[in-house]
């Protein structure tokens, strides 16, 4: 038989995403165990059932849309840091063309010189 004088302890999640220890205390006038942190919640209105209320669905939909808008704002940042990595077209022209008159095109360097030496004959 359980000792009704000692509270039952359990872990509960606080509103700040912290875990703390709560306790269940025995109430002699009730058939159920009441959490010690539940005092004063007699006037609390529970969230309506989603099957009986469409307002909950519309509230959740509104929240999802608001989150999506915030995400869009977060991605509309300054993109100059990315575009600066792409060289301008003027930078792609070899400098030797002006000096040599463009008569002889330069040979392209391979990224993998060992692989380029194995050309099919």
Curated annotation (Swiss-Prot):
The keyword Signal does not apply. Keywords: Acetylation, DNA-binding, Host-virus interaction, Inhibition of host innate immune response by virus, Inhibition of host IRF3 by virus, Inhibition of host RLR pathway by virus, Late protein, Viral immunoevasion, Virion. GO terms for molecular function: DNA binding. One of its GO terms (cellular component) is virion component. Residues 84-121 are annotated as: Disordered. The modification N-acetylalanine is found at residue 2. Coiled coil: none annotated. The keyword Acetylation applies. Residues 104-121 have a biased composition (Basic residues). Induction: Expressed in the late phase of the viral replicative cycle. One of its GO terms (biological process) is symbiont-mediated suppression of host cytoplasmic pattern recognition receptor signaling pathway via inhibition of IRF3 activity. It is found in: Virion. Acetylated. Disulfide bonds: none annotated. Belongs to the asfivirus structural protein p14.5 family. Structural protein required for transport of intracellular particles from the assembly sites to the plasma membrane. Binds to both ssDNA and dsDNA. Suppressed the activation of the cGAS/STING pathway by interfering with the recruitment of IRF3 to TBK1, which in turn suppresses IRF3 phosphorylation, decreasing interferon production. This is Protein p14.5. It comes from African swine fever virus (isolate Pig/Kenya/KEN-50/1950).
């Amino acid at each position: 038989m359980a000792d009704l004088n000692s509270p039952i302890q359990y872990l509960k999640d606080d509103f700040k995403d912290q875990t703390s220890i709560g306790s269940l205390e025995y109430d002699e006038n009730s058939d159920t165990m009441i959490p010690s942190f539940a005092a004063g919640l007699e006037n609390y209105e529970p969230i309506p059932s989603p099957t009986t209320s469409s307002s909950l669905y519309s509230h959740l939909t509104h929240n999802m849309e608001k989150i999506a808008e915030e995400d869009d704002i977060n991605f509309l940042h300054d993109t100059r840091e990315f575009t600066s990595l792409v060289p301008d077209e003027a930078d792609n022209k070899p400098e030797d063309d002006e000096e040599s008159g463009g008569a002889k095109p330069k040979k392209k360097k391979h990224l993998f010189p060992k692989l380029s030496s194995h050309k099919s004959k």
